[in-house]
From Swiss-Prot:
GO CC terms, sorted: cytoplasm
HAMAP family on file: PanB (MF_00156)
Entry's localization field: Cytoplasm
Residues that coordinate or bind Mg(2+): 44, 83, 115
Region forming the signal peptide: none
Record-given protein name: 3-methyl-2-oxobutanoate hydroxymethyltransferase
Superkingdom of this protein's organism: Bacteria
Function: Catalyzes the reversible reaction in which hydroxymethyl group from 5,10-methylenetetrahydrofolate is transferred onto alpha-ketoisovalerate to form ketopantoate.
E.C. no: 2.1.2.11
Subunit and partners: Homodecamer; pentamer of dimers.
Biological processes annotated in GO: pantothenate biosynthetic process
NCBIfam families named among the record's database cross-references: panB, PRK00311.1
Pfam families: Pantoate_transf (PF02548)
């Protein structure tokens, strides 16, 4: 039976961790599905990981659709989540709905992910009202890398931390059913997770999120040119074993540890957030 957003809300209520992995092809999707990974994200990170691009900004809708089709064929139980690429939803309401629907109709995804907060809340509302589950993404948002000045931890001061909290509330109110929180201080992610009713999925944001996500290639140590602080290599000899280790460590709370997280907020500053 296919996993659903309802089941992930139930996991949050029961304090059971949600597992997510970014993957881009049929065979890796089969492995993740067999390992009972909850969500397979067909991330626009494939631009760099698979296609050798410098960032995620150049990958197209057609390219994302092809890879999402492959993952959907391999995943029978896992929820397949498709990343909407840069400028596929920001430009107009019409583009947002039409492109989101293409992932469902053509690539058989189960939901879509978008980056941004208050500024795209109206797009989230339109897509979700059309019956498509929407996952939001805050903190370090790679599609806004030129605005952020690079790949840096976000929410390190009172103003930026409060902005992320306000954005999180806005996307939930707009109809987002899950939130990815990338590269924010541990205590900020914990605060967001406690405020929201929807599940949070962390990457570089500490152990208090309702789940975790890593890229398939990264957790297996397949990319020797990339090793971010928040990445842990589990097993590159046997992918199935590596994924199972990742799954078990997320569910038990072993991963992520402090060494895979960022902490810039003191308790005095945290108390000022609302």
């Amino acid at each position: 039976m296919r996993k659903s957003m309802i089941s992930f809300l139930e996991k949050k209520a029961k304090n059971e961790k949600i597992t997510m992995v970014s993957a881009y092809d049929y065979h890796s999707a089969k492995i993740l599905d067999n390992c009972d990974i909850d969500i397979i994200l067909v991330g626009d990170s494939l631009a760099m990981t698979v296609l050798g691009m410098q960032d995620t900004l150049s990958v197209t809708m057609d390219e994302m659709l092809i890879f999402t089709k492959a993952v959907s064929r391999g995943a029978k139980k896992s929820f397949v989540l498709a990343d909407m690429p840069f400028m596929s939803y920001q430009s107009s309401d019409r583009d947002a709905i039409l492109n989101a629907s293409r992932f469902i109709k053509e690539s058989h995804a189960n939901g879509v992910k978008v980056e941004g907060g208050i500024e795209i809340a109206s797009k989230i509302k339109l897509i979700s009202q059309s019956g498509i589950p929407v996952v939001a993404h805050l903190g370090l948002t790679p599609q806004a890398v030129n605005m952020l000045g690079g790949y840096r931890v976000q929410g390190k001061d009172l103003q930026s931390a409060q902005k992320i909290i306000d954005d999180a509330k806005a996307v939930q109110d707009a109809g987002a059913c899950m939130l990815v929180v990338e590269c924010v201080p541990v205590k900020l992610a914990q605060k967001i997770s406690s405020i929201l009713e929807i599940p949070t999925i962390g990457i570089g944001s500490g152990k208090y999120c309702d789940g975790q996500v890593l890229v398939y290639h990264d957790l297996l140590g397949l990319n020797k040119d990339f090793k971010a602080k928040f990445v842990k290599h589990f097993d590159k000899i046997d992918p199935q074993v590596g994924v199972e280790k990742y799954r078990d460590e997320v569910k038990s709370g072993i991963f992520p540890s402090q060494e895979h997280s960022f902490d810039y907020l003191d308790d005095e500053l945290l108390d000022k957030l609302y």
